[in-house]
Amino acid sequence: VMNNPEYMEVLKITSTPNSISTLTAAACTEMFKDNGYINESQSQIFTERNLIYSAMSTNKNVKLFKPYANYMLVKILKDDISANQIASQCNLKGIVIRNCENIRGLSNKYIRFCFMKPEQNDLLVNTILELL
């Protein structure tokens, strides 16, 4: 199947873009039973989302897409910096962000990251802003 271009095209069209494993699905199902965890997570995400958006919104080298979930999409406006460069620098500091160049409609000028713990978010924002 994998060597047949026709089958691969059908799989590409019909498959879920970000599928999850059975183990991940089971963990998520259990997690959603814990209301305390859900409320605490929502509160932390709300706080961190607003702090990060405020901290980055004054930089003219990025376009922020206002987040309404637990992640933010950012377009890099500085010509000599790519998403790969930012992702590599973040990775060196133990922070994983998504280079969005392989997402249809985006390019190597887009990154996406989830909101984390405050200390990790501070390191993330400082790393990105130092490059820009």
Ranges and model annotations:
Residues 44, 55, 89, 127-130:
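Alpha-helical scaffold elements within enzyme catalytic domains, especially in hydrolases
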Residues 1-58, 62-65:
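PLP-dependent aminotransferase class I/II
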Residues 92-93, 102-132:
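PLP-dependent enzyme catalytic core of the Aspartate aminotransferase-like
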Residues 3, 16, 77-78, 116:
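Structured loop/turn residues at secondary-structure junctions
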Residues 27, 72-73, 106-107:
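Short secondary-structure capping/turn micro-motifs that flank functional sites
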Residues 45-46, 50, 59-93, 115:
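Conserved PLP-binding catalytic core of the aspartate aminotransferase-like
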Residues 15, 49, 98, 112-114:
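Short, cationic motifs built from Arg/Lys/His that form the positively charged side of catalytic pockets
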